[in-house]
C-alpha cells in the first residue's frame, strides 16, 4: 500500500484511497493508513481462515460501497474473494501476486520459482476473477533469478518490483487506458 500512497502524494497517480480494510486485527497496514490520514478498519472474517465469504463478505461490500469505492485493491490480503464481491465491483478488483502468472499461483511462489530452476521470476498485477490468481493480467515486472539466490533474497527483489507495478497498473486504470478482450488486457 505504501507505494500507492506515495504515488498519490507525489501526484504520480490520480486516485484517492477512500478506505483501508485489513483482515488481521493488528495489521501494520491499519497503522500506516492512519498515519496518512486514511480511514482504516479491521474486517472480522471469522470463522474462515482463507476465504472472504458469508457475513464478512457482506460487511466488506457494505463498507466499500458506503465509502464510495469504485475499485478494490488487494495488497497483502491473503484470502480468496468470492463472486459476490466480484459482482459488486465488476472488473474493478485488482490483486498483486509475486510471480509471473500464470506460473506459480498461490502461496510461496518465489520458493517455487527457485525449486523449478527458473531463470526469471517477478510480479503480476491482475484483475481478480473467480479462480486463484487467474484473472486477466495488467502489468508484469521480471527480475533475474541469481545463482546464489535464497527464497529471501529473491522475494526481496520481487518486492521492489511490486512497489513499481501496482501504481503503474492503477495509473492505467485511472486514466481509462485498460481494455479487456477475453483474457488479454490491452493498454492504450
Sequence positions of predicted segments:
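One-carbon transfer enzymes
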Residues: 1-188
Amino acid at each position: 500500500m505504501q507505494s500507492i500512497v506515495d504515488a498519490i502524494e507525489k501526484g504520480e497517480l490520480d486516485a484517492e484511497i477512500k478506505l483501508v480494510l485489513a483482515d488481521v486485527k493488528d495489521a501494520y497496514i491499519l497503522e500506516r493508513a492512519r498515519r496518512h490520514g486514511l480511514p482504516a478498519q479491521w474486517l472480522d472474517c471469522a470463522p474462515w481462515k482463507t476465504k472472504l465469504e458469508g457475513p464478512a463478505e457482506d460487511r466488506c461490500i457494505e463498507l466499500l460501497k458506503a465509502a464510495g469505492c469504485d475499485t478494490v485493491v488487494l495488497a497483502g490480503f491473503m484470502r480468496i474473494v468470492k463472486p459476490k464481491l466480484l459482482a459488486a465491483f465488476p472488473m474493478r478488483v485488482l490483486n498483486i501476486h509475486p510471480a509471473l502468472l500464470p506460473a506459480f499461483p498461490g502461496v510461496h511462489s518465489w520458493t517455487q520459482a527457485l525449486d523449478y530452476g527458473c531463470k526469471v521470476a517477478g510480479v503480476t498485477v491482475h484483475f481478480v476473477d473467480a479462480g486463484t490468481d487467474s484473472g486477466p493480467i495488467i502489468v508484469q515486472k521480471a527480475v533475474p533469478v541469481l545463482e546464489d539466490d535464497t527464497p529471501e533474497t529473491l522475494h526481496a527483489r520481487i518486492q521492489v518490483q511490486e512497489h513499481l507495478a501496482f501504481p503503474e497498473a492503477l495509473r492505467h486504470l485511472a486514466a481509462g487506458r485498460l481494455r479487456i478482450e477475453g483474457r488479454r488486457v490491452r493498454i492504450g
